[in-house]
């Protein structure tokens, strides 16, 4: 069968002379399909993408060894309804409105002001506190020998701010957001949505019909994009390499989240040493520990509750930076403005090459928070973040650094605590207080970014499941992960007590930041080629400039590995192994379940009673298979004396889109003939979706969606009966069945016969909302009776009770497996699986409604 992916990918035609053309719309797909090419209606597809065209797929039906697929494909082919017009819902033809995204709603002026204030408090905290420590770390190892050294260092800072936070992130990377979600995994999700690069083979063709997907017209301009897409999809090595890069970047993000609070808070508390000479380094560490404990304790209150309070505080902080900078330039002179000439960088390296090279690690710290700014995009619009950074944040930062440089040019020996020494005496203590508050805000910024990243990684199968608490009723992007919060606190306290100095922490800080930055550069480059389809010259310029600059910085910070930065690298490596082992074990488990699923031939041999007694009720069997009957169902048949009269195989599936609209949540298909009363249900969630419904609400939504599916199925069969039995000749059959229109309101119109209003005659009736059938009245009555019987059967089964059938599928490595595989699967993955949060826990099902069966797979 042919596989297709959404996004800007290809529109493969094929087979039977049919051709499909797609054009990009806001949230819907326009389809004109000749009946020969209508095979795209097959929702459940082969995971390996074999067979290039619908013709090939249909030709293989007779000889397919998987009878489950044979039956489903035959059922799909028999329902020959061909759609054109806006596809408002992948399941329900009665949907009247295209499912939209909340973020596209019009925002009022008042709301924009509130969001702007929150943007300061949530997005720019980290980058805003870099003036506290950037010059301190730059001049830590070598003293300042001349004013030209200050101008050279300042010029480095200015152009680092312009090239990394402004050019790379604000003007380019922010546009790589996945419907408002930023960060490493959002970029990976965007790539997965446009090319089948995920190592977990559970993608469905129906996933690309979610209204969050957007498709483009194939053209000459797409040729390069399609070649890259094909190469990514066919090369398992490239898929693994891409995943490894993403996991490495994510581990660095988490490591960054440990270093950022330690660095920001300790650098702010260091200001006490300037105001109170009796304060020593040990007391600074103890105060830092106390502030960090308070910080992580308050994290559970969420961003929206705190952002309105800290937003104005951070605005005052940026005003302080600008004011102090202007004061220092007025006091010590404006000669520092010469640093805007990049030649001073050349002069700096020419005079002191070793000192200049070593200072690059500290210079990079002025750009810290750039990745957090991207990862914390959340519900803020790209333009609002861009405007705030360009017109407020960047000017204030530049003025702050210019003022510190002006102070240094007149005080060459005062190369530590530069920021606090440059504060006017009258404003010292208020600024120290605001600096500590800004440092706390910066720490929250990075922690919030980590929560968002962990949620994305969990949804894409790359991190063990953890309890996630949504802290805002209005914005789904604001979350709190208790276990991760306390893990970050413990790790952060360990780093503070271990290093005890902002200079040593600063070295580790640079390594963490650069690791994330380089991964972002690679992923954005792939997006430029695959999705944005930008001119190759522009892409090469971006890659060369960004990656080249980051590698230069990286060469500098590597020199500090022996000074203690190796601890951070070990920490990141452990996180990387956890994520890789979880993804590897999850992939093996899924592939094994696919291989051991029950064949349709066996179910047919058992008959509609499945070889046991069917008792009234609905059984919801949870499994991870997106297609087929899971092998765990055989365990239920073997161990239980009876089985429910209706069985629904439920798969909770995370798709690579931020949000799945509620009316597109459930995808249903029959597993066997009607008499079996067996269905497959795929409950689809985006990685920003909130699974807040309890088990009662969930089963109510599921059953309502099942009833809609049955009505749609009956409507399509009624259309078939009318098209094939109600025409007078083969020519009329071909005309009526070649194309049909399902309107946005669910009405069905034949495109072979013009509507009466358009033709000006009633000779050929339109099949619409008030339709008249030329076919057999008996067949229509039988079809309606069959639908009523099925709906009545569902209601009776529901009244008898709904039971959740849970299978604990565990995996163990075979005896002949390599030692490393046994160690990874039998111990590490098993440990993670035992201690992670079970997916069914979110539904809070009472034990009286659960039945559990264990099954072990050998891999």
Curated annotation (Swiss-Prot):
Q: Which residues lie on this side of the membrane: Extracellular?
A: 134-155, 262-275, 327-359, 410-417, 500-508, 559-560
- Which intervals carry biased composition (Gly residues)? 1-19
Q: What is the lineage of its organism?
A: Eukaryota, Viridiplantae, Streptophyta, Embryophyta, Tracheophyta
Q: Which residues are glycosylated?
A: 411
| Organism encoding this protein | Oryza sativa subsp. japonica (Rice)
Q: Provide this UniProt record's keywords sorted from A to Z.
A: Glycoprotein, Ion transport, Membrane, Potassium, Potassium transport, Transmembrane, Transmembrane helix, Transport
> Composition bias, kind Polar residues: at what positions?
763-772
Q: Where does the sequence pass through the membrane? A: 113-133, 156-176, 241-261, 276-296, 306-326, 360-380, 389-409, 418-438, 479-499, 509-531, 536-558, 561-581
InterPro entries for the chain: K+_transporter, K_trans_C, K_trans_N
Annotated region (Disordered) at 1-69, 752-772
What's this protein's name?
Answer: Probable potassium transporter 14
GO cellular component assignments: membrane
* Family the entry assigns: Belongs to the HAK/KUP transporter (TC 2.A.72.3) family.
Which Gene Ontology biological process is one annotated for this entry?
A: potassium ion transport
> What residue spans carry the Low complexity bias annotation?
54-65
Q: A Pfam family name for this chain?
A: K_trans
Topology relative to the membrane = Multi-pass membrane protein
Pull the Cytoplasmic topological domain ranges from the record: 1-112, 177-240, 297-305, 381-388, 439-478, 532-535, 582-859
State its location(s).
Membrane
Question: PANTHER family from the xrefs?
Answer: OSMOTIC STRESS POTASSIUM TRANSPORTER, POTASSIUM TRANSPORTER 7
Q: What does this protein do?
A: High-affinity potassium transporter.
Could you cite one Gene Ontology molecular function of this protein? Answer: potassium ion transmembrane transporter activity
Give the primary localization class: membrane
